[in-house]
């Protein structure tokens, strides 16, 4: 067998665990103003998937050191002067009010406020599967969908929405598109 020169420094693949759609307890790590959106950086904070997003980031950083991104981000879009403004404002108010009530924070969101005040806040977050096509790969990944109270999380009083499919998706292609061919089991295998 042949050896290769950088064997010792080559990264190994690690198990890539997929977060299932569902509801999880999350802790906000920071709140950042990012031009068009308030970005809440969070991680799961209880159960089997505790620290899921930080673990995924570390794993991705080992494999893709220049392009890895932290995926535990919930974006609340600021009004932009278009038809989605009312929805964006309602979503932002709903999320911020829930965070405030669940964590007994004393923040007046109608005035300028410091995003650091949200650090350490715990809430329930619903994730739904979202279909993707990226660099030739196709699949589903769980994405933040909305927030719920810790009581709703504990009692299971929430609904996980149906997966969000791509507009041009053909998730169940017919067999002709798969380009499979039948193998006659009576024939010898080619190796």
Where do the protein language model's features map onto the residues?
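Short beta-rich binding modules
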Residues: 1-191
């Amino acid at each position: 067998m042949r050896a290769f020169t950088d064997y010792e420094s080559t990264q190994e693949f690690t198990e890539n665990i997929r977060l299932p759609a569902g509801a999880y307890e999350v802790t906000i790590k920071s709140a950042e103003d990012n031009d068009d959106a308030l970005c809440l950086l969070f991680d799961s904070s209880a159960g089997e998937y505790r620290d899921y997003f930080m673990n995924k980031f570390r794993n991705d950083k080992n494999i893709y050191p220049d392009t890895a991104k932290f995926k535990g981000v919930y974006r609340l879009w600021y009004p932009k002067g278009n038809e989605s403004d009312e929805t964006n404002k309602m979503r932002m108010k709903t999320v911020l009010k829930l965070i405030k009530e669940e964590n007994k924070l004393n923040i007046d969101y109608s005035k300028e406020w410091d995003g650091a005040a949200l650090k350490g806040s715990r809430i329930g977050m619903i994730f739904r599967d979202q279909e993707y096509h990226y660099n030739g790969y196709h699949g589903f990944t769980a994405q933040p969908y909305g927030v719920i109270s810790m009581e709703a999380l504990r009692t299971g009083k929430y609904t996980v929405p149906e997966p969000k499919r791509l507009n041009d998706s053909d998730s169940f292609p017919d067999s002709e598109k798969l380009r499979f061919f039948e193998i006659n089991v009576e024939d010898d295998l080619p190796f």
